[in-house]
């Protein structure tokens, strides 16, 4: 590491200097840029705050910027509408309102560019109003109090009526002053006025008269304002306008009740009938109009789609009756009769042996039906091998049947049924064969078309064909080649000469190909046991299941016979015998019986093995099974010998609870055969015979170690050592005869205390009980209980 630093310290130092230099420059640049941006932002915000406060000082401290200077002068707007019977205010021109007559304000057409630009737009509005004139409420036009122009005001009479006169009037504009309109004047005012008046220059059907609904009584309505106002143009006002003066008239409730709304009666006979449905042969009565032709429709589409019927005085215009009306997508001729071919009938195979099902030796061809020709008589399709005769065609009217030999167009065009399709037919469905079927059961029906002949398929490559009627016999199960393969091949070869190759779903299958896979095993099924099966010796498969000898007089001879047993040779037969499965160990049943009963009772004979289903094994398979059984017997004998020679572990003493009585602790020790002590058997005896080992020694309690039994310290020391079975039985019999009851077990860690302190014989289990007696003095009885 030192050499690396000595060699590269100059380079590292130069690099650090360069990095520090550029980092300083970048930091300085970022700091300057941020300072300048913050400073400029502060100055801009300060300037905005100062300008806002100066502008808002006149407006009683408004925080929003004052932009009312960009609005239009209120004097340029028309006055608000008046109520029915209310007098209009007097303008600067001094003209008074006349309540008896309703006049239309006239305007003069000046040379103003704004008005010139407005004329085409107004003409367009008038032409649109000509199409359908909707009745509007009579809102009068008020006078605009400007020095540049003055308008005549109108008032409504006491009874509401339409403000549209019966005659057509042209709009005349009378110039009051030679001056032009101000620059801020917009054509929206005249647009609103023209829309309310609904007066057009052209002669058009006038709308039906409808009385205007009276306006509700409200306060002063705010003036109508135009939406599109240029914000940068200021209104130059030369002289102040005169304020409006209103006269309010109370609303009359009885006037609405006395006014009757007249509904005109429309003559329904003069209305043209609705269009009829295309499938209906007869049209409705009272139709005076004929369906227009395509040429008239193309010429009058634009006019007919725009013009509507105008109703004047309950009469319809006569020119509307003969106006051509276009349909949704064209014209429909109800007299035409469309004759379509009926849908094909679904394929149904005949249940009986009909004459139309004919077998050929190699093929069964299907002839397609001829093309359908619509004639007066129903065209029937010829019967084929699997096609039923179709339904007859529907007979239409005589007009459609006039052209007999001309094929009619279908829904999407004409169809040709005799086109060759290069697709193989689908496989034949499988149905149950009837009793009257003349076909042989082993000869299947082959199905192919004339276009797809199977002559190119060589029989050398496909000698055997898998079909539904030809089923090879199930071969026997073995590990080598299949039995009867030669007979199967010969049988298939004979049948393949009579059967032509039949194409399957994905191709043709060859059963002659050799298959090297073993046959699948048959399912295992338990069969009933028979009495004629010879009883075999049960095999020991678990440590808990060891066969107990039947004869109690010669137990050792039986054990030796089991140890030296050799498996018997079983000839191959259809029935294969396996040993029964081991029984689960039940500890509760073992503890319920005493050892004396276990030795006296005879063991149950081994269960007979269950029979298996016939497996049809060959001699080779039987020999292989016998070899496996020999190996199995050898392994079981070795396992049995190792279990018997295994050394038994030392027993674990367990303390006996004090709740047990002395009767349960009594030990009946007799040297007779078949009787043993009633000690608790440890868990290690599950896998060993009971009679092979003596009972384990049981420790005694210190309380029962009297001077008669324990004479010296050496004898007590020998008590902890494991003794032989004979010595232990002799000592236990002497103590049981002298005391009459068995002492309880002693814990493990009490042996050392029994040597040094024999004075603790009368003490309890707690060794510290003598120290606890006077350790804490008794408290005085304060409560005198």
Curated annotation (Swiss-Prot):
Highest taxon in the source lineage: Eukaryota
Keywords of the record: Membrane
Biased composition (Low complexity): 91-102
Topological type in the membrane: Peripheral membrane protein
Signal sequence annotation: none
Compositional bias of kind Basic and acidic residues: 249-260, 478-497, 587-613, 624-637, 672-686, 700-710
Region listing for Disordered, in residue ranges: 33-122, 142-406, 418-785
InterPro entries: Aim3 (IPR031370)
Family stated for the protein in its record: Belongs to the AIM3 family.
Protein's name in the database: Altered inheritance of mitochondria protein 3-2
Gene designation: AIM3-2
């Amino acid at each position: 590491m030192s050499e690396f630093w000595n060699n590269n310290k100059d380079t590292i130092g130069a690099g650090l200097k360069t990095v520090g230099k550029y980092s300083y420059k970048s930091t300085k640049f970022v700091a300057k840029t941020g300072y300048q941006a913050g400073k400029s932002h502060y100055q801009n915000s300060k300037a905005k705050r100062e300008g806002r406060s100066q502008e808002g000082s006149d407006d009683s401290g408004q925080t929003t910027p004052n932009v009312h200077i960009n609005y239009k002068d209120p004097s340029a707007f028309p006055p608000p509408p008046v109520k029915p019977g209310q007098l209009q205010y007097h303008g600067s021109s001094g003209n008074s309102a006349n309540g008896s007559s309703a006049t239309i304000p006239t305007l003069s057409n000046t040379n103003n560019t704004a008005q010139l630009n407005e004329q085409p737009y107004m003409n367009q509005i008038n032409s649109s109003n000509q199409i359908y004139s909707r009745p509007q409420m009579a809102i009068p036009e008020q006078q605009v109090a400007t020095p540049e122009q003055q308008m005549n005001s109108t008032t409504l009479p006491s009874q509401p009526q339409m403000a549209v006169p019966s005659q057509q009037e042209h709009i005349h504009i009378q110039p009051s002053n030679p001056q032009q309109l101000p620059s801020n004047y917009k054509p929206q005012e005249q647009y609103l006025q023209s829309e309310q008046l609904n007066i057009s220059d052209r002669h058009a059907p006038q709308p039906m008269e409808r009385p205007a609904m009276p306006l509700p009584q409200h306060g002063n309505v705010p003036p109508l304002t135009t939406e599109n106002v240029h914000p940068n143009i200021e209104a130059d006002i030369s002289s102040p306008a005169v304020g409006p003066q209103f006269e309010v008239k109370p609303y009359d409730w009885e006037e609405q009740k006395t006014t009757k709304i007249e509904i005109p009666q429309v003559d329904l006979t003069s209305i043209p009938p609705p269009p009829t449905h295309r499938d209906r042969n007869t049209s409705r009565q009272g139709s005076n109009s004929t369906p227009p032709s395509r040429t008239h429709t193309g010429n009058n589409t634009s006019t007919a789609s725009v013009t509507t019927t105008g109703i004047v005085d309950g009469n319809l215009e006569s020119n509307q009756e003969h106006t051509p009306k276009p349909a949704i997508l064209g014209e429909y001729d109800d007299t035409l009769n469309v004759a379509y071919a009926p849908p094909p009938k679904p394929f149904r195979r005949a249940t009986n042996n009909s004459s139309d099902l004919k077998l050929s030796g190699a093929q069964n061809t299907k002839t397609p039906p001829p093309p359908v020709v619509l004639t007066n008589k129903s065209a029937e399709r010829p019967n084929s091998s699997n096609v039923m005769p179709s339904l007859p065609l529907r007979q239409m009217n005589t007009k459609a049947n006039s052209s007999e030999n001309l094929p009619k167009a279908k829904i999407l065009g004409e169809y040709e049924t005799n086109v060759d399709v290069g697709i193989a037919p689908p496989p034949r469905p499988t149905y149950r064969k009837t009793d009257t079927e003349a076909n042989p059961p082993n000869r299947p029906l082959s199905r192919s078309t004339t276009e797809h002949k199977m002559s190119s398929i060589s029989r050398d490559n496909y000698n055997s064909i898998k079909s539904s009627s030809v089923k090879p016999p199930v071969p026997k199960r073995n590990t080598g080649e299949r039995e009867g393969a030669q007979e199967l091949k010969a049988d298939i070869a004979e049948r393949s000469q009579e059967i032509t190759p039949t194409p399957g779903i994905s191709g043709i299958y060859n059963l002659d190909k050799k298959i090297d896979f073993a046959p699948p095993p048959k399912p295992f099924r338990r069969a009933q046991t028979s009495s004629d099966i010879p009883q075999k010796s049960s095999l020991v498969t678990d440590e808990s299941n060891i066969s107990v000898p039947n004869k109690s007089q010669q137990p050792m001879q039986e054990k030796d016979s089991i140890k030296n047993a050799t498996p018997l040779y079983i000839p191959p037969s259809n029935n294969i015998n396996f040993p029964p499965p081991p029984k689960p160990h039940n500890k509760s049943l073992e503890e319920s019986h005493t050892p004396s009963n276990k030795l006296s009772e005879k063991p149950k004979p081994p269960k007979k093995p269950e029979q298996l289903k016939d497996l049809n094994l060959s001699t080779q398979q039987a020999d292989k099974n016998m070899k496996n059984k020999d190996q199995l017997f050898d392994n079981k004998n070795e396992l049995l010998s190792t279990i018997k020679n295994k050394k038994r572990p030392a027993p674990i003493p367990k303390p006996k609870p004090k709740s047990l009585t002395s009767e349960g602790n009594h030990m009946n020790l007799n040297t007779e055969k078949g009787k043993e002590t009633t000690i608790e058997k440890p868990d290690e005896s599950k896998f060993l015979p009971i009679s092979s080992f003596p009972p384990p020694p049981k420790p005694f309690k210190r309380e029962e170690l009297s001077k008669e039994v324990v004479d010296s310290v050496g004898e007590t020391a020998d008590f902890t050592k494991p003794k032989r079975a004979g010595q232990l039985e002799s000592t236990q019999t002497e103590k049981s005869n002298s005391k009459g009851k068995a002492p309880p077990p002693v814990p493990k860690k009490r042996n050392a205390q029994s040597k040094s302190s024999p004075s603790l014989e009368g003490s309890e289990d707690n060794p510290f009980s003598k120290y606890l007696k006077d350790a804490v003095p008794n408290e005085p009885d304060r409560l005198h209980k």
